[in-house]
Swiss-Prot record:
GO terms for MF: metallopeptidase activity
Function: Probable metalloprotease.
InterPro entries membership: Metalloprtase-TldD/E_C, Metalloprtase-TldD/E_cen_dom, Metalloprtase-TldD/E_N, Peptidase_U62_metallo, TldD, TldD/PmbA_N, TldD/PmbA_sf
Name recorded for this polypeptide: Metalloprotease TldD homolog
UniProt record similarity statement: Belongs to the peptidase U62 family.
GO biological process: proteolysis
Annotated EC: 3.4.-.-
One GO cellular component, as annotated: cytosol
A Pfam cross-reference name: PmbA_TldD_3rd
Keyword field contains Nucleotide-binding: no
Organism from which the protein derives: Haemophilus influenzae (strain ATCC 51907 / DSM 11121 / KW20 / Rd)
Keywords in alphabetical order: Hydrolase, Metalloprotease, Protease
């Protein structure tokens, strides 16, 4: 893989390992702790269907290099959208300005150590996994399926995207690493209407594999067909929904995608930069009980073919499974190289960046809660009056206070231990640690989301995974309209 990526990114400009060592030498007489080069090629393609016709098709290709130098807590960063010696030299001259001139102690490595991690996905180009005709056929199949599912379907929108990336990382700590990253996603949105009332449903999936995955047959149906039917089902549920109640009440969260609440309310607060700056609710709490003892939460970038998985992170560190909270006790934070060094701990393979034009920072990969021991039916049976929320929409969280607001996209009343009427307009309002300490039951099956997650932080978006088993929160504020 290293040879293939080098041939793509370096060979066309006659760049060699020795040439790149010389780039580090430009910065070597400054008081710099660490420096790295991040080369990237990306190709992305998307198709959009609306009203039964292809409304949009796009293709974009980009390549460039980011140059970073770190001195203490200061970072110098420059990037170029051309990969050549002159651009690298200009970037290196720019970033070294963050540090004082010093004598000796060159930071430039004498040689690189090639990182040979376990591959977490196949090194394929998903743009080439289906012909243009088959990609369009897939979107039309989704459209036909959704419309045939129910006469109340009035509008179907679907998008199909695929991304191919090659990255190469070189650093003054001797790191030399490369990765080839495929990524695909199918997104479906359906609008239904009855007696003047309109509601929407959505579904989607994806991961690090080829587009042909959507044509595979599972449980007697093509995957894309199943996703289209699920979008219609969700829309029809909301069409018959009544107004959600409001107030303090028990809530049962479904398995899988509702883990997005965990991601936002807990996950971001466990990223190393927030804790180094003491701006997280979890700062200084390692070894303390921060959630219910029923909760064990991990961030695992090693799961094969998952959207949030990485063979290496964007600093060349192999991904790993990090236990963040075990039996309710905080174990540690997610780290990149800079924050790990400043905090005196090891990096965890969580250094991520949107592209060569962005700085790396601690980010999640696939963050989820492990299974418990309760049966799902027992969770529902234990609630006299409350809400069951199997699907979430958007949400937001304040990292410092831990307070969050999340809207449900599908929810039901629980009455006398049984799931009854669907409800609309339910929002969950609370504080991360407080809510996590009120988890009293955790189901015995954990699920990951379908592969649609995108996480934003400081203007950067990266693909992520979330997940959890179904779980019961004894008391949380539900914002509703009734």
């Amino acid at each position: 893989m290293l040879n293939q990526v080098s041939n793509t990114l370096l060979t066309p400009s006659n760049l060699s390992t020795q040439t790149l060592l010389n780039i580090f030498d430009i910065m070597s007489h400054r008081n710099i702790d660490y420096a790295d080069l991040y080369f990237q090629l990306s190709q992305d393609e998307s198709w959009v269907l609306e009203d039964g016709i292809i409304k949009e098709g796009s293709f974009h290709i980009d390549r460039g290099v980011g140059v970073r130098a770190v001195s203490g807590e200061k970072t110098g960063f420059a990037y170029a959208d051309q990969i050549n010696l002159a651009s690298l030299q200009q970037c290196a001259e720019a970033v070294k300005g963050i540090a004082q001139v010093k004598q000796g102690n060159l930071i430039s490595p004498s040689a690189f150590n090639v990182v040979n991690p376990i591959a977490r996905y196949a090194a394929i180009n998903p743009l080439e996994s289906l012909t243009k005709e088959k990609k369009i056929e897939l979107l039309h199949l989704v459209d036909r399926t959704a419309r045939a599912e129910d006469h109340r379907v009035t509008k179907v929108s679907a998008s199909l995207s695929s991304v191919y990336e090659e990255v190469l990382i070189m650093a003054t700590d001797g790191t030399l690493a490369a990765d080839i990253r495929p990524l695909v996603r199918l997104s479906i949105s359906v609008l239904v209407e009855e007696n003047g009332k309109r509601e929407r449903g959505s579904c989607g999936s994806g991961g690090r594999f080829g587009l042909d995955w959507f044509f595979e047959v599972v449980d007697g149906d093509i995957r894309a067909v199943l996703f289209a039917k699920e979008a219609v089902r969700q829309a029809l549920v909301n069409l018959s929904a009544v107004a959600a109640p409001a107030g303090l009440m028990p809530v049962v969260l479904g398995a899988g995608w509702p883990g997005v609440l965990l991601h936002e309310a807990v996950g971001h607060g466990l990223e190393g930069d927030f804790n180094r700056k003491e701006s997280s609710l979890f700062t200084g709490k390692i070894g303390e009980q921060v959630t219910s003892p029923l909760c064990t939460i991990v961030d695992d970038g090693t799961i094969e073919n998952r959207r949030g998985s990485l063979t290496i992170d964007d600093e060349g560190v192999p991904s790993q499974c990090n236990v963040l909270i075990k039996d309710g006790i905080l174990q540690g934070y997610m780290q990149d190289k800079m924050n790990a060094r400043l905090m005196g701990v090891s990096t965890t393979g969580n250094g991520r960046r949107e592209s060569y034009a962005h700085l790396p920072m601690p980010r999640m990969t696939n963050t989820y809660m492990l299974a418990g021991q309760s049966q799902f039916d027992d969770l529902i049976a234990s609630v006299k009056q409350g809400i069951y929320a199997p699907h979430f929409g958007g949400g937001q969280v304040d990292i410092t206070s831990g307070k969050f607001v999340f809207s449900t996209s599908e929810a039901y009343l629980i009455e006398k231990g049984k799931i009854t009427k669907p409800v609309k307009g339910a929002t969950l309002i609370g504080s991360g640690i407080e809510v996590m300490q009120k988890i009293s039951m955790v189901a015995d099956k954990s699920e990951l989301d379908l592969g649609i997650g995108v996480c934003g932080k400081e203007g950067q978006s990266v693909p992520v995974g979330v997940g959890q088993p179904a779980l019961k929160i004894d008391e949380i504020t539900v914002g509703g309209t009734n």
